[in-house]
């Protein structure tokens, strides 16, 4: 007889707080761009935020009492595997910093959307239906990749089909027809999410790989 989980237990099992934060970054990126903020204004904020995030991890690795407090407060926003490892938010910040610093702004924003939404979708779909489909990489299922693909198509439609629709947008200037661009974006999101680059954190790999591929095709 199965025991019914409490909301707290169910939320922890499915990483609801972490996924909610992860997903919200995509909406926040759209909000910032919609309000007229640009990479040059956002990069210093990321650099400032990186300092306490990195320092906090260094302290908790060397001070058990602080580590217990840190995990009690920040723990719900972390994977279980991060409790004794570097916090994923550090890699998130590095990945976003790189794409904002190196790539055109629209490509940077799209790569953040793919990180924020495709990664969460792949994780959610993979946990639910991954056991019914083949594994395509370590901890990656075909079901999760299909979820990431659909979400990548959705990201492209929302961003370049609804949000950035002017004649000066990269999508409008691209020689690739928009429906094909949506499909390609889906493949890029799925590929980047499933990719294992020297064991690096997905939060770093997904935006950088996505931005590189988008830059090449656009």
From Swiss-Prot:
It is a multi-pass membrane protein. This is CTP-dependent diacylglycerol kinase 1. It catalyses: a 1,2-diacyl-sn-glycerol + CTP = a 1,2-diacyl-sn-glycero-3-phosphate + CDP + H(+). Belongs to the DGK1 family. One of its GO terms (cellular component) is nuclear membrane. It comes from Schizosaccharomyces pombe (strain 972 / ATCC 24843). Residues 38, 110-142 are cytoplasmic. Residues 1-19, 60-88, 164-179, 218 are lumenal. GO terms for biological process: mitotic nuclear membrane biogenesis; phosphatidic acid biosynthetic process; vesicle-mediated transport. It is found in: Endoplasmic reticulum membrane; Nucleus membrane. It is an enzyme of class 2 (transferase).
